[in-house]
């Protein structure tokens, strides 16, 4: 068993790990870093409000309420504009810059962003180099990649390009774009080969769901850093589970998190935001908590915020009553 404690980073999951979820999960965990949802860059220097909307932590020194640093992730294909927006993100307080070369979304790939860049290692090199040159050397530049578009044959060329461009570290999701998130397609061995090849830190990502899978991933890859996304939603205290081999959070504690989440003020919410996000989160939670299946069945047909909130409060009350008895 590997006894050293790994760096644990909270992944950038678009439309899932939003500022509210980051605030909640970093309060109950021990993350070393969290990465924002991507900021889409096209052909302009974006207004500050775009960065503040996606990463409001920038308004408080680049930290979550619990003190976890936030790194802004940029998505795009034009080196000049990626560089200009990277510079702005640093000025606003981002702890370094992350460049997205792994998002498998059809919409994103259709506009030549995210994983679509894996087809063009030279463009990845140019974009990463432009970002690195625009950002002060004291600020880290990282790149998140997959093993390739439809096969892993170019993974070394891509990783080499990222290192040669001056990136400080690289996060490798152990599947190709076409693999999607199929568990049986995870390839930690390829991450390990990249780690052996490079001189910069390599962070492993993909199918890290509990203490045992984290241990196995580290044994195979020899990576000292891990990035977790879906697993962090399945098991809300996963970083502590991985770092300290503690038990997963009890369902009663998960209910309290759901209660906190549904009560978080959101001035942009028209009444549907928390409704959709609670249902979405329950779908992740049911991978680790059978009780989440029952709660989802209760709320799935509820379309009002007040209705969902009432169901969550009732579930908390029932649980407290059961525990008291």
Swiss-Prot record:
What family is reported?
A: Belongs to the Dus family. DusC subfamily.
According to UniProt, the name of this protein is tRNA-dihydrouridine(16) synthase
The record's function comment reads: Catalyzes the synthesis of 5,6-dihydrouridine (D), a modified base found in the D-loop of most tRNAs, via the reduction of the C5-C6 double bond in target uridines. Specifically modifies U16 in tRNAs.
- According to UniProt, residues marked as the site described as Interacts with tRNA are 40, 100, 181, 277, 279, 284, 300
Task: Give the main EC class.
Answer: oxidoreductase
Active-site residues from the entry? 103 (proton donor)
Name the catalysed reactions. 5,6-dihydrouridine(16) in tRNA + NADP(+) = uridine(16) in tRNA + NADPH + H(+); 5,6-dihydrouridine(16) in tRNA + NAD(+) = uridine(16) in tRNA + NADH + H(+)
Q: Which residues form a coiled coil?
A: none
Listed Pfam families: Dus
Q: Which residues bind FMN?
A: 12-14, 73, 144, 205-207, 229-230
What's the source species for this entry? Answer: Haemophilus ducreyi (strain 35000HP / ATCC 700724)
Q: Which gene encodes it?
A: dusC
Single GO molecular-function term?
flavin adenine dinucleotide binding
Q: What is its EC number?
A: 1.3.1.-
Task: Give a yes or no for keyword Ion transport in this entry.
Answer: no
Assigned keywords, A-Z: Flavoprotein, FMN, NADP, Oxidoreductase, RNA-binding, tRNA processing, tRNA-binding
Q: Record keywords: Ion transport included?
A: no
